[in-house]
Amino acid sequence: MKIERKPSTALLPTPVVLLSVAGHGKEKDNIITLAWVGTVCSAPPMLSVAIRPSRHSHRLVDAAREFVVNIPRAGQLEAVDLAGVWSGAEHDKFAELGFTARPAKQVAAPLIEECPINIECVVRHQLALGAHDLYLAEIVATHYDEELLDSRGRLKTAELDAMAYVDGEYWSLGERLGSHGAAAKAAGRKG
């Protein structure tokens, strides 16, 4: 039996990322933890991030029009959680959370050295949706820790140790279940 509830954000899980953005004027570079992030286009490669207008980082992204999406490891949970709770208006999150800012190649926002994947982005569109603004951003550079790539340059996902966000809780990712298209191939069918 199904139980109907009021409309909610029940699309689960969502990734856990650290978005870094360059400071504006006298403000320091900042980090915000986000879970409402997703791939939206493959050519050109684009992603989306949703940020509440009340957040300090929202103002910085509006000014900079670029940012870096950094993928943290599960072992960084405490710093990840604090980056999402503390305000950059009151905390120097890079210094206080022990993160190292490294220059990006294409944008002014810094990479977080301790994160194994860094995705440089330039905002192409912004939509005011209600509680959140949605930024659609083109990916202009992607960086991987070398040990995460196999000899063919493919991601060794099992070694990434990424996190997911589900209903107010952080979760680790489980085991590999299969590959895209494997069921159709096994059944002798094509799309």
What are these regions (language model features)?
Residues 1-191:
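Basic, polyanion-binding surface patches
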